């Protein structure tokens, strides 16, 4: 009986990638905040993730299933979250202000406030720095493709 209760407690405390994740600009993405520990991240998003083998630092890919592309990437530095960004264009992801992935670029500039464009290879990132944090809006062919959160002035371009 104790073993069964312990198992229920473990399962209940295990998080998972949100089905319709939210960006709170300057604060969190998918329920994860910059500076959280690796353990806090796994508690929030669960233990199902892949590791990037070609990345400079430790990067985890939380996806909706094995061999699926959409989800959330978490970059860690010294065991803490240093950057977050969506993978591909996960359906249903949105901002606290109602901006949804798939929106046209004009909606981003209207709803996100003042942003600065950064040219990357094949796409543009509209960034806004505030309170030591950079919120990134990834735009491909005039359409909002993804969200990101990192330290202010960090390079938002991802490969």
Model segments located where?
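Extracellular beta-rich ligand/substrate-recognition surface
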Residues: 88-90
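Generic low-complexity, intrinsically disordered sequence content enriched
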Residues: 9-11, 27, 49, 148
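Generic serine detector
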Residues: 13-16, 28, 110, 135
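Bacterial Sec-dependent signal peptides at the C-terminal "C-region" and cleavage site
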Residues: 2-22
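Second-shell loop/turn segments in exported
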Residues: 25-32, 92-99
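Long, compositionally biased, intrinsically disordered segments
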Residues: 18-19, 25-28, 36
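Eukaryote-biased recognition of intrinsically disordered, low-complexity regulatory segments
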Residues: 82-86
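A cross-family detector of function-defining hotspots
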Residues: 36-80, 99-159
